[in-house]
UniProtKB/Swiss-Prot annotation:
Belongs to the RemA family. This is Putative regulatory protein MAE_11840. HAMAP family: RemA. The lineage of its organism: Bacteria, Bacillati, Cyanobacteriota, Cyanophyceae, Oscillatoriophycideae. PANTHER family: REGULATORY PROTEIN SSL2874-RELATED, REGULATORY PROTEIN TM_1690-RELATED. NCBIfam families: MtxBflmRegRemA, PRK04323.1. Pfam families: RemA-like.
Length: 89
């Protein structure tokens, strides 16, 4: 299985294989997920102080905050899936 990476802004990268959901942070349930992750120490803030526009939830229950739009992250995710990087062995 190849490791595929997604740029989530400002040089930050997450593993595409570990992503469960990419959602907008405006709803109350997502705000609660962010708050719970912060309390548990499972929150990764990759916004560099900017407004949170996308919340990425991973299979390890980590929550990653990104300053780019969820649609942009999802587009990068789809493009990555269609054109995987060839690894030289």
């Amino acid at each position: 299985m190849d490791i595929q990476l997604i740029n989530i802004g400002f040089g930050n990268i997450v593993s595409a294989n570990r992503v469960i959901a990419i959602v907008s942070p405006e709803s109350a349930p997502i705000k609660r997920i962010i708050s719970d992750a912060r309390d548990k120490g499972c929150l990764i803030d990759a916004t560099y102080g900017r407004r949170t526009r996308a919340v990425i939830i991973t299979d390890s229950s980590h929550v990653v905050l990104s300053a780019i739009q969820p649609e942009t992250v999802a587009h990068r995710f789809v493009v990555n899936k269609e054109a995987p990087v060839n690894s030289s062995n």
